[in-house]
Amino acid sequence: MNLKIIKTDDGSDTLYNKKLDETYHSLHGSVTESKHVYINAGLSSVIDENSKGPISILEVGLGTGLNLLLTLKFAKKNDLKIQYHAIEPFPLDNSILKKLDFNNKLEGFDKKIYKKIHHPKNLEPVKLSEHISFTKSITRLEQISFEKEKYDLVFFDAFAPSKQPDIWSKENFKLIREAMKTSGVLVTYSSSGKLKKILEELKFNIEILQGPKGKKEMTRATK
């Protein structure tokens, strides 16, 4: 098997991809990292701008679904309506999914909802809760015809640029930018020089923020 479950420092699980020699999340804590990058620096930052309507989120790299689980929890707590579209060309096998453990770090973790996240039909909307409508595209980002100016927020959570550089291409970020609303926000754990250069060339407003534990910096970019 190409994937191995690893317990991270905050007690939550992540996956190690042997082929890429890369983990899905930080070994310092998968929940800790995802909450810092995608919820605190991402979702929290767009609430005021979208208080009167649903927030539209695009995630590049659904992976274990952890960012979506944290979004579900945040949406319930803050009574938000969210339309969530995730791209994942390589969905995880059920034999791995059923062994992943987030119970100890995610209060109210619902296995029925988790099953819906990982087994919806391609592009068929699924209502995960009264707060979130979810769509999953089982394909590569560059193969999607995006609606223009649709997304308020983008979670870019693909494998590292050093491992899968093609995903971090200027062409892909151009597609994403066109799909973002004016003042839309993109957040990612990466702060690589190549990423900064691409975002600058595409006229994003870039903020280099403090990273989660074990990582000095992360990136937030606004259209």
Sequence positions of predicted segments:
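Glycine-rich SAM-binding Motif I of class I
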Residues: 65-69
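Core SAM-dependent methyltransferase catalytic element
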Residues: 202-223
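A short SAM/SAH-binding and catalytic strip from SAM-dependent methyltransferases
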Residues: 152-166
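S-adenosyl-L-methionine
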Residues: 96-147
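Conserved beta-strand signature within the Rossmann-like core of class I S-adenosyl-L-methionine
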Residues: 155, 182-190
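Conserved S-adenosyl-L-methionine
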Residues: 61-63, 88
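Rossmann-like AdoMet
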Residues: 1-55, 72-102, 106
